[in-house]
Amino acid sequence: DMKIVFMNKQPADIENVLNDNIVYVGSDEMESGKYQGEFLSDYFKAQGKDEIKYLMVNGVLGDIAQIQRTESCLQAFEDQGMTAVEATAPVVADWDRANAQDLISPLVNTVDFDCIIANNDAMALGAAEAMEQQGGDLENIPIVGIDATVDGCQAISEGRLAMTVFQDADGQGFGALTAAVNLIEGNPINEGSEYELDETGHIMWVPFEPVTAENVEDYM
């Protein structure tokens, strides 16, 4: 039988697609949003706040990454005892920096919000640029992203973004090659790596890592 390794982007209906010959290597999107929610919960609790209003800048609606990054962030707020209310209708910027800037700009001075949560760094940077252009309070309104891109990490070091989440592309590539060899040889797909499998043995998880001002230098 043909061996297939999906990498990074999960196939639709993943539970019914994967089997002993068809596997997936990637990062658990539920983990990435969780890190955003935990960071923001700690940030606001340190100020004595347990109720916040947020702007959510979404990728393409319906993408598995958009759904799980958003849901896991909001779940983390709940798990941390935070009351988080969306300040306006969801902002849908389709993963694009310019779209995010255009959509956030009119909200900066018309909507009351405590933070901006973006499904990726590109949109987080667009939101930061909108805040800067419209005179928003970047110092006290944290913006968080996901991916730990070069620009995203640079923005953290400059204080323009508060945090991001590192998605290990090299690790995913190594994991996919490892899984392919193991499929051919009949071994568990994570053999020879440090990565964990899900309960089915058909998914190899490459962990996300939170990136803040404290550790951003390690990712630049």
Predicted regions located by residue number:
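Flexible loop/hinge segments that line or gate small-molecule binding clefts
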Residues: 1-31, 53, 149-157, 161-162
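Hydrophobic alpha-helical
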Residues: 1-4, 72-73, 89-154
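Second-shell loop/turn segments in exported
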Residues: 19-30, 59-63, 88-93, 112-114, ...
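Hydrophobic alpha-helical segments within soluble ligand-binding/sensing domains
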Residues: 24-52, 99-101, 148-152, 168-187
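Short, solvent-exposed amphipathic alpha-helices that sit
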Residues: 32-39, 64-83, 99, 103, ...
